[in-house]
Regions:
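Alpha-helical transmembrane segments of multi-pass membrane proteins
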Residues: 1-278
């Protein structure tokens, strides 16, 4: 990092950021300006500063690191950058007015992490790349939590966002399970997929009950449905006799649990949230 190229890019990025802050501090002056008006130049300067600083560090990682360590550092830095920007821009770009960019950035964070893990582009037994990817996962989780909290606090409970958040969280959970199994030397993900989905389904159901959220309970049942379909359509026919017996036992247990939930809790499962809070 101690080179002229890095220092120059870093200075340009910080200077651009400083100019954007000055525009915000003297907003009335720049609002009346002929050329450098506050709108849209303040937003452009902020985004340009973020892009320059991001490129500055990514270029250094590409130049001085190699292999799985380089891709891991780039992944962790990207995940951290998206989270930091979501937090740093909360006042300048309120989530009420810029909902789509926040939700898009949240989805991109999960997608970038998933592409890196599922791409099998790293050495599973190497400690440093593995730790970097777990750091990346931590930043992605923090990003999901922060944006979700801001959304629910400032905008309120909206079914489309809850569904979107659960899809991202489920995809992230499966990817983290895949990463853990790869680090443990397990290439096959069939069993891990089913177990991970089952755990996610139980968590969704528990949260749906505790938070009185009908949509979460329905999503949980959909998750269990995916597990059942996979067991019936794929796992059952690809296994030997003993494996089929185990699958039938698992199917029986899942169906028994779902039957119990429906018979004992059907009024709670499908009751409207408004009725539950009355």
């Amino acid at each position: 990092f101690l080179n002229s190229s890095f220092a120059t890019s870093l200075f340009v990025g910080l200077a651009t950021r400083a100019f954007a802050l000055l525009m915000g501090r003297y907003r009335s002056l720049f609002t009346e300006a002929r050329y450098l008006r506050y709108t849209p130049w303040n937003s452009i300067m902020l985004l340009a500063a973020a892009a320059i600083l991001y490129y500055t560090f990514m270029a250094e990682f590409a130049l001085h690191l190699a292999g799985a360590t380089r891709s891991g550092m780039m992944l962790a830095f990207t995940s951290a950058a998206i989270f930091i920007l979501s937090y740093a821009f909360k006042k300048r770009f309120p989530i009420k007015q810029y909902t789509i960019p926040y939700l898009t950035a949240m989805g991109m964070n999960v997608l970038i992490y998933a592409i890196n893990i599922w791409g099998d582009q790293w050495v599973y037994t190497s400690l440093t790349p593995a730790l970097l990817r777990w750091f990346a996962a931590a930043f992605v989780i923090a990003n999901l939590y922060y944006v979700a909290r801001q959304y629910y606090t400032l905008i309120g409970l909206k079914t489309p966002f809850t569904v979107y958040l659960n899809v991202l969280a489920l995809f992230l959970w499966l990817t983290m399970a895949r990463s853990f199994l790869l680090q443990a030397g397990v290439e096959d993900f069939d069993a891990g997929f089913s177990v991970s989905l089952s755990i996610a389904g139980f968590i969704q159901m528990a949260l749906g009950m505790r938070l009185h959220q009908k949509v979460l309970r329905i999503i949980s049942l959909s998750t269990f449905g995916i597990v059942l379909l996979k067991l019936i359509l794929k796992d059952l026919w690809a296994m030997p006799t003993i494996g089929k017996i185990i699958v039938f036992i698992i199917l029986g247990l899942i169906l028994l649990i779902l039957s119990f939930l429906y018979q004992k809790l059907k009024d709670v499962l499908f009751k409207n949230d408004e009725d539950e809070t009355d």
